[in-house]
Amino acid sequence: MYTSVLLNVESTILDFWRLLKPRIMYLVVFTAVAGMVTAPGSMHPFLALISLICVALGSGSAGAINMWYDRDIDLLMERTKNRPIPSGRVSAESALEFGITLGILSVFIMAIAVNYISAALLAVSILFYVFIYTIWLKRRTPQNIVIGGAAGAFPPMIGWAAVTNSVSWESFILFLVIFMWTPPHFWALSLNKSEDYAKASIPMFNIVYGPEKTRKYILIYSVLLVLTSLLPALFLKKALLYLSMAIFAGCIFIWYAISILRFKNHNSQKQMFSYSISYLFSLFASIIFCSIDLF
């Protein structure tokens, strides 16, 4: 009996954890770390930890509310039908309450423990993801990812503001890198999930304009992304080292973009999507490494 109860509790905890979209949350926190490390000045380690926890909670809040709102279309898509809400493991009301609570807590704690600017940016990122992307753009325009991608680009600015209590052109450049990365990343996924998106009536770029035009735009955005990724060298301590890392990773990114335009198959698009995740991690790892003095 006790074993059964424990298993049910564990299963419930895991389902609420899945509401947070943890894979996205890890990337969000990592890019926030990059913003903190590149910022001038210093921050007490405990406050830095609090800041990152708030960023994680804010990201999870947006993810949970997104799953609450999208529960109807999630049920129609193979990729999402087993999520906690459409599968019936978590009620829609519980998910919404969970998401709102996390969002309020994250912004409140950030404001009280860290500073108001970082808290305001965190609030804007949550609200942008929920209201601008999820509720307004996602089901209405093929530019949903292009504009909505701004929501996921805020974490480096939040990290920077947590340290400096300000917003600067340097943090905006980090924002811009993620903003330019988002379209080719998600379009590569949507090319392989066209039937899912069509079934759910989501006007992804490839559904509205076709796969061939989407592949061309992936290449265009990939080139723009790689060019944008060179800009952090303007303020990093190890600028030349960073440039070499960014150019190397960027050339591979463009190679994958050319591959999907050339081969036009599921495998090349899957490889592009997978590499895009590794690319962003490696790029921001390079930013972190080239911001610190090890010797």
UniProtKB/Swiss-Prot annotation:
GO annotations of cellular component type: plasma membrane
Catalytic activity reads:
heme b + (2E,6E)-farnesyl diphosphate + H2O = Fe(II)-heme o + diphosphate
* MF terms in GO: protoheme IX farnesyltransferase activity
Q: What class of enzyme is it?
A: transferase
Query: What residue intervals traverse the membrane?
Result: 24-44, 45-65, 94-114, 117-137, 144-164, 171-191, 216-236, 240-260, 272-292
Q: What is the protein name for this chain?
A: Protoheme IX farnesyltransferase
GO terms of biological process kind: heme O biosynthetic process
Q: What does this protein do?
A: Converts heme B (protoheme IX) to heme O by substitution of the vinyl group on carbon 2 of heme B porphyrin ring with a hydroxyethyl farnesyl side group.
